[in-house]
Regions:
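Hydrophobic ligand-binding cavity/cleft-lining segments
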Residues: 2-68, 159
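Hydrophobic pocket/interface hotspot
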Residues: 42-47, 53, 73-75, 90, ...
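A conserved amphipathic terminal alpha-helix motif
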Residues: 2-9, 13, 128-171
């Protein structure tokens, strides 16, 4: 009788843990990049001017907070047929080089997304922006189109490129 009760309980506990462990080893990754005719400093300035996001950013349509390690941001995304607000924690903020944050859905381990922006100096006042995200968590294998963000990343990259290049010409 006890085995009849414990077997379903064990399955309910083991399956989510196993799926979570699997996604830690096999995360879902999204990566985009674009070359920009602007210095890494100018790209960083545009990327971290959160107050201006509503003017130009088609993906992260608003962002509040400070780009500093440990800070909590409030970001509102547009895409996949709707909007979503989330509050990631900044993991890295190196001016002209890297901005990285960790966002979580509901609680740690359900769906975790580590989002990053890397800025590479190509010389001659040019940069490469790499934007990506690594998704892990128990629901990642079942999230389907909810994690299809590559088009949103690419749209943001193109808009950031246009804004940074325009700002670079004004200097």
């Amino acid at each position: 009788m006890l085995a009849w009760f414990l077997t379903p309980v064990a399955v309910l506990l083991v399956v989510p843990v196993a799926v979570y462990a699997w996604t830690r080893v096999n995360p879902r990754k999204v990566r985009t990049e674009i070359e920009i005719d602007a210095s890494p400093e100018k790209v960083w300035q545009v990327l971290t001017d959160f107050a201006a996001y509503p003017q130009w950013n088609p993906f992260i349509v608003s962002a509040q907070g400070e780009p500093s390690v440990g800070a909590t941001l409030t970001n509102r995304l547009a895409g996949n047929g709707g909007e979503m607000t989330f509050t990631p924690t900044v993991l890295a903020a190196t001016p002209g080089r890297e901005l990285r944050w960790l966002g979580r859905f509901v609680m740690p381990g359900v769906v975790d997304g580590e989002h990053y922006f890397l800025i590479e100096d190509l010389g001659g006042g040019r940069s490469r922006l790499i934007q990506g995200e690594t998704f892990t968590g128990a629901l990642v294998p079942f999230a389907g189109k909810a994690l299809d963000v590559a088009d949103g990343f690419a749209a943001m990259n193109a808009a950031l490129k246009a804004r940074a290049e325009q700002a670079e010409k004004m200097v």
